[in-house]
């Protein structure tokens, strides 16, 4: 019989315990992102959002076309040529009724841009077409007014903002766009006049028959194969 003090199994137990603790500490350290890693992820999100903003031609309406170095990049209408005529007058000059919509300043300026809105509010605007100033800073889980944090009396973004198409973009893409607008742009103080459009344009003209549902109907529909 081996004396207790010389039993190799008794010596092995504390060694294994020490190794296990060290391994746990190393594992925990490996799973926690460092400040630099967190910053890198945020930078990649902003860069991805920039790519989407350029490729989706946001500057075509909000200023700067597809050139982030251009004067007036995303800071809103600066000339009547950037305005949009809505109604019969868009086809026949002078016809009535006639409304004018003006793309807003998308830079993070608190007074004249979107700086006062959170990234979640911007996401909700892109996903649901809701005006960010009247949108809660929470996740929305329904498209039915009054349910799932969806506003009871929703007010929608003015045309030609193509939110019925953008709403089908993945969450990570819409959040990346919000991140770029909030954290990737310099604030520009430029007040854009309010649009002279029909109130709640989308609320009065939007129908699932014309614009489909969110989420979109499952593939294939009657027009697909």
Language-model features, listed with the residues they occupy:
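Hydrophobic helical h-region of N-terminal Sec-dependent signal peptides
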Residues: 15-18
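N-terminal module-boundary/linker segments of secreted carbohydrate-active enzymes
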Residues: 39-40, 48, 52-54
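C-terminal motif of bacterial Sec signal peptides marking the signal peptidase cleavage site
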Residues: 21-23
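Flexible coil segments in periplasmic/lumen-exposed cytochrome c-class electron-transfer proteins
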Residues: 32-37, 42-44, 63-101, 131-225
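Bacterial N-terminal signal peptides that target proteins for export
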Residues: 2-13
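Bacterial signal peptide processing site
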Residues: 25-27
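C-type cytochrome heme c attachment motif
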Residues: 51-63, 104, 121-127, 175-179
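Mid-length scaffold segments of soluble, non-membrane domains
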Residues: 102-105, 109-116, 130
């Amino acid at each position: 019989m081996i004396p207790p003090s010389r039993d190799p199994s008794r010596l092995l137990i504390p060694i294994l315990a020490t190794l296990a603790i060290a391994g746990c500490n190393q594992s925990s350290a490996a799973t926690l992102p460092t400040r630099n890693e967190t910053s890198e992820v945020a930078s990649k999100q902003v860069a991805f959002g920039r790519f989407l903003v350029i490729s989706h031609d946001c500057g075509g309406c909000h200023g700067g076309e597809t050139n982030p170095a251009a004067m007036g990049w995303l800071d809103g209408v600066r000339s009547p040529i950037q305005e949009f005529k809505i109604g019969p007058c868009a086809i026949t000059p002078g016809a009535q009724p006639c409304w004018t919509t003006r793309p807003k300043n998308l830079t993070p300026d608190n007074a004249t841009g979107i700086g006062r809105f959170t990234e979640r509010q911007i996401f909700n605007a892109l996903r649901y077409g809701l005006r960010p100033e009247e949108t809660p800073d929470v996740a929305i889980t329904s498209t039915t007014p009054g349910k799932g944090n969806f506003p009871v009396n929703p007010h929608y973004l003015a045309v030609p903002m193509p939110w019925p198409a953008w709403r089908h973009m993945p969450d990570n893409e819409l959040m990346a766009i919000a991140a770029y607008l909030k954290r990737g742009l310099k604030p520009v103080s430029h007040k854009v006049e309010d649009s002279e459009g029909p109130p709640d344009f989308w609320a009065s003209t939007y129908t699932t028959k014309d614009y489909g549902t969110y989420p979109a109907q499952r593939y294939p529909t009657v027009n697909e194969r």
